[in-house]
C-alpha cells in the first residue's frame, strides 16, 4: 500500500511540504516538494557498484520543466517538450554545484538526480524548490552524501533583506541572490545586484544561510522517519608504501615544474614527469593500476602547489597573492562591428563585440513563469583552440551557457533603460585564450565593447576571480587565479562590478569551514583588484562614444495619436509594408502610439517620419492640399491627399465651367491642387479643384488637353 510520509513547515512567507513514499518507489529515493503551489518532483538513483576503471565521479543532474505545470500545451511543432532550454540548463547547474562537493572523495558510483517541475505558481520560482528536493532525496537515499543542504533566495527591498521574495517583489528588489549550504557552511552563491556594497552582499549571504537552517532541520527530521539505511561504502584503503615510492620519484621534479611560468611549457613538463614516473613504476611491478598511480600523482601535484602558497612563496607564475596579471586593453579592433574590444589578462583573452538591433530583434522567451522579452543578449563561446586543444565545435555546452549568464549578470546593472536607449543589444564573447577566469574577462571586454558601440552604460564594469587555499586555520586568498589554482584550490569566487559596487557575485566552495571573515577578506581583496582593472580599462576608453557606429541602425522615436495607428498600419498591414519598402527603414508601432523608425541613413529616417506625419495629420476643412488622382469615375475623380487619404472631387468641382467628360480634364496619376470642402461623420472627404484654383489665382483652372480641344 502507498504510505506517504509528509512534513510541512513555514519558510519565510511560504509553506513548504516534503512528501515521500508515494511515487517512484523503484528509484533509490524520491521526494515531492511544494512551495505555495509550485511543486517539483525529484528522484535520485545511485548505482551500488562503480564501473571498473572509473576514475571520476559521474554525477548527472537533470532539471526539466513540463508545460502542463502551468496549464499549457507546448508551442513546438511536435507539441511536446524538447531539449533543455537555457533556463533549465542554468537551474540544473544551480542544483549540481552545492551537492557535488558533499560526496566523499573516492566515491565514483554513478548517481543521477532528476528534478521535474509538475506544478507552477507564477509567483514562486521552482529553482529553490528543486534544490531543496535534490537535497532531501539524496539525504533519504542512503547514498554517501554529507548533506543535507538548504537553499534560499534573498532580495533587498527598502534597505531590508527579504527571504524568498515573490516574482513581483523581485521586480522591486536591488538584489537577486541564491545561497546554498550545509548546517555549518556556505557552499554556493549565485547573484546579480544593482551595484551593492561588499558589506551588503556579505550580509545577504549570511542572512540566507541563517534562514535556510529550517530547511535542513526538516529534511533531517524526514530522514529519521523515512530514510533508507546508509550504504556500506568505504573508500579504497591508502597504499602508504606506494604513495611514498611515487613521492620519492616525482615530488621534487613536480615542485620544479611548477616554477615554470609559461602554461604550455609547464603542462608539457608535468606530463613528461607523470609518464616517466608511471613507466618506471610499471617496469618495477606490472600489476600496478595505472589509474591509481595517476591519482597519487595528482594528489602530490595538488599538495606541491598548495603548500607553496600557504608558505608564502610566489605562485605558479611568480606572482604574489594579490597581484593581477599583465593587462592589455584595446577597443575598436573590428572595423565593421558596432563595437568591439580585445581584453587580455595574462594568458586569458576575450574578443568581445556589441551589436545594436531594433525591438524586433529582442528574444521572446516562452517560459513556465510566463512570456518575457529580453532586449539584452549575452553569448559566450569557448572554442577548444583557446586551451590549445582540438574538440567539437557546435551548439553551446552547459559550461558556456553558465559562464555567459554570469558575465551577463555582471553587465546587466549598468545597461541603460529601454526608454533612454531603445535598442536590443547583443554581446558576444569569443574566448581566444584561456588560463583562468574567462567569464570575468568577458565582463571587462563587454564593458569596453559597449562603450565602443556608443551604448550609454551607467558605469564601466570589471570582473575578477578569487581563489582560496586553506589548511586548518591557515589560509591564503589569491587574486586573479589561474586555471590550475582554480582546480587545486578550495574556493572559486568571482566578483564583477563598477567603482560604486557589486553587480554579480558567484561563489563555489569545495570545503567546509569558510567563515564570514574569510569571505570578507576575499571581497575586499576583489574590490582592490576590480579598481585596478577599471583604472587600466579607463586608459583605453573612459566614457561611451558620443555617437553610435555608422553601421548601426539609428532609431528615431515619434509619437502619434493611438487612434491613428490603424491608418499607419493599413488594411492587412498594406500601408506600413509599403512605407518600409518605400523608405528602406524598419518601423515598429506600440499600442500607446510610440513609433520607432530604424535606419542606417538619416535621410531615409526623415523621409519615413515625414510620410507618417502626412498619414496621421488631421485633414483640415478649407485647407488646400496637393493631391494625386488615383481613380476616375463618371461622376468625378478620387484624389489621394495627406498620406494616402482619398477624397472625391465631384464632376461639378473640377472646373468653373460645365465638364462633360472627366478625362478631358484629369488623367490618372496627375497632381492637382484640391481644397477640402467637408469631412463627414464617416470620414469621407469632399474636395474641390475649382475652389483650390480660385484661391491660388492667378493660376488658372486645369485646361482640357490641347489635342482633345482641337477635336
Curated annotation (Swiss-Prot):
InterPro entries attached to this UniProt entry: ExoRNase_PH_dom1, ExoRNase_PH_dom2, ExoRNase_PH_dom2_sf, KH_dom, KH_dom_type_1, KH_dom_type_1_sf, NA-bd_OB-fold, PNPase
Name this protein carries in UniProt: Polyribonucleotide nucleotidyltransferase
One of the record's GO cellular component terms: cytosol
Keyword Magnesium belongs to the record: yes
Biased composition (Low complexity): 694-711
GO BP, one annotated term: mRNA catabolic process
Region of interest called Disordered, as start-end residue ranges on this chain: 689-711
NCBIfam families: polynuc_phos, PRK11824.1
Subunit structure: Component of the RNA degradosome, which is a multiprotein complex involved in RNA processing and mRNA degradation.
GO MF annotation: an example: RNA binding
Cofactor(s) listed: Mg(2+)
Residues at which Mg(2+) binds: 486, 492
Gene3D superfamilies assigned: GHMP Kinase, N-terminal domain, K Homology domain, type 1, Nucleic acid-binding proteins
Annotated EC: 2.7.7.8
Keywords in alphabetical order: Cytoplasm, Magnesium, Metal-binding, Nucleotidyltransferase, RNA-binding, Transferase
Domain called S1 motif: residue spans: 622-690
Catalytic activity: RNA(n+1) + phosphate = RNA(n) + a ribonucleoside 5'-diphosphate
Species the sequence originates in: Escherichia coli O8 (strain IAI1)
Amino acid at each position: 500500500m502507498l504510505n506517504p510520509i509528509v512534513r510541512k513547515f513555514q519558510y519565510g512567507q511560504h509553506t513548504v511540504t516534503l512528501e515521500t513514499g508515494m511515487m517512484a518507489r523503484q528509484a533509490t529515493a524520491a521526494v515531492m516538494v511544494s512551495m505555495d503551489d509550485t511543486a517539483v518532483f525529484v528522484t535520485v538513483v545511485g548505482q551500488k557498484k562503480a564501473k571498473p576503471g572509473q576514475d571520476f565521479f559521474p554525477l548527472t543532474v537533470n532539471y526539466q520543466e513540463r508545460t502542463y505545470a502551468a496549464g499549457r500545451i507546448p508551442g513546438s511543432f511536435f507539441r511536446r517538450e524538447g531539449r533543455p532550454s537555457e533556463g533549465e540548463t542554468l537551474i540544473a547547474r544551480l542544483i549540481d554545484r552545492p551537492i557535488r562537493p558533499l560526496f566523499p572523495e573516492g566515491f565514483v558510483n554513478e548517481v543521477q538526480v532528476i528534478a521535474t517541475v509538475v506544478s507552477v505558481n507564477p509567483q514562486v520560482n521552482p529553482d529553490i524548490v528543486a534544490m531543496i528536493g535534490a537535497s532531501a532525496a539524496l539525504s533519504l537515499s542512503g547514498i554517501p552524501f554529507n548533506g543535507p543542504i538548504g537553499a534560499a533566495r534573498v532580495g533587498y527591498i527598502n534597505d531590508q533583506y527579504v527571504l524568498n521574495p515573490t516574482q513581483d517583489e523581485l521586480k522591486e528588489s536591488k538584489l537577486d541572490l541564491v545561497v546554498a549550504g550545509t548546517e555549518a557552511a556556505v557552499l554556493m552563491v549565485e547573484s546579480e545586484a544593482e551595484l551593492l556594497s561588499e558589506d551588503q552582499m556579505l550580509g545577504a549571504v549570511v542572512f540566507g544561510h541563517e534562514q535556510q537552517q529550517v530547511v535542513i532541520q526538516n529534511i533531517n527530521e524526514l530522514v529519521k522517519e523515512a530514510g533508507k539505511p546508509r550504504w556500506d561504502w568505504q573508500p579504497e584503503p591508502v597504499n602508504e608504501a606506494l604513495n611514498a615510492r611515487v613521492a620519492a620519484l616525482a615530488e621534487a621534479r613536480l615542485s620544479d615544474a611548477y616554477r615554470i611560468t609559461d602554461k604550455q611549457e609547464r603542462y608539457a613538463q608535468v606530463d613528461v614527469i607523470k609518464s616517466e614516473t608511471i613507466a618506471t613504476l610499471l617496469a618495477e611491478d606490472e600489476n600496478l593500476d595505472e589509474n591509481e598511480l595517476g591519482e597519487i600523482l595528482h594528489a602530490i601535484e595538488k599538495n606541491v602547489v598548495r603548500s607553496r602558497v600557504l608558505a608564502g612563496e610566489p605562485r605558479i607564475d611568480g606572482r604574489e597573492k594579490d597581484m593581477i596579471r599583465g593587462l592589455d586593453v584595446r577597443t575598436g579592433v573590428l572595423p565593421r562591428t558596432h563595437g568591439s574590444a580585445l581584453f587580455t589578462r595574462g594568458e586569458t583573452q576575450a574578443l568581445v563585440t556589441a551589436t545594436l538591433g531594433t525591438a524586433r530583434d529582442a528574444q521572446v522567451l516562452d517560459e513556465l513563469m510566463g512570456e518575457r522579452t529580453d532586449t539584452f543578449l549575452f553569448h559566450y563561446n569557448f572554442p577548444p583552440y583557446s586551451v590549445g586543444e582540438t574538440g567539437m565545435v557546435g551548439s553551446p555546452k552547459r559550461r558556456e551557457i553558465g559562464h555567459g549568464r554570469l558575465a551577463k549578470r555582471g553587465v546587466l546593472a549598468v545597461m541603460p533603460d529601454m526608454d533612454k536607449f531603445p535598442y536590443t543589444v547583443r554581446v558576444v564573447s569569443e574566448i581566444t585564450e584561456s588560463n583562468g577566469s574567462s567569464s570575468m574577462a568577458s565582463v571587462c571586454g563587454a564593458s569596453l565593447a559597449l562603450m565602443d558601440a556608443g551604448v550609454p552604460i551607467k558605469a564601466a564594469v570589471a570582473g575578477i576571480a578569487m581563489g582560496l587555499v586553506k589548511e586548518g586555520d591557515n589560509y591564503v586568498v589569491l587574486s586573479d587565479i589561474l586555471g590550475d589554482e582554480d582546480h587545486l584550490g578550495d574556493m572559486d569566487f568571482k566578483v564583477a562590478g563598477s567603482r560604486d559596487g557589486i553587480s554579480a557575485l558567484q561563489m563555489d566552495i569545495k570545503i567546509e569551514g569558510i567563515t564570514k571573515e574569510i569571505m570578507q577578506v576575499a571581497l575586499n581583496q576583489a574590490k582592490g583588484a576590480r579598481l585596478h582593472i577599471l583604472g587600466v580599462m579607463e586608459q583605453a576608453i573612459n566614457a561611451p562614444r558620443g555617437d553610435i557606429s555608422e553601421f548601426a541602425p539609428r532609431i528615431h522615436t515619434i509619437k502619434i495619436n493611438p487612434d491613428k495607428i490603424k491608418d499607419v498600419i493599413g488594411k492587412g498591414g498594406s500601408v506600413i509594408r509599403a512605407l518600409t519598402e518605400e523608405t528602406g527603414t524598419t518601423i515598429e508601432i506600440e499600442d500607446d502610439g510610440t513609433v520607432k523608425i530604424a535606419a542606417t541613413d538619416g535621410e531615409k529616417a526623415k523621409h519615413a517620419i515625414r510620410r507618417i506625419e502626412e498619414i496621421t495629420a488631421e485633414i483640415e476643412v478649407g485647407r488646400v492640399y496637393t493631391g494625386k488622382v488615383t481613380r476616375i469615375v463618371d461622376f468625378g475623380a478620387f484624389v489621394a491627399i495627406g498620406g494616402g487619404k482619398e477624397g472625391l472631387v465631384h464632376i461639378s468641382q473640377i472646373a468653373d465651367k460645365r465638364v462633360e467628360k472627366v478625362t478631358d480634364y484629369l488623367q490618372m496619376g496627375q497632381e492637382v491642387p484640391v481644397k477640402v470642402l467637408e469631412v463627414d461623420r464617416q470620414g469621407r472627404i469632399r474636395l474641390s479643384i475649382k475652389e483650390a484654383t480660385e484661391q491660388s489665382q492667378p493660376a488658372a483652372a486645369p485646361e482640357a488637353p490641347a489635342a482633345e480641344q482641337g477635336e
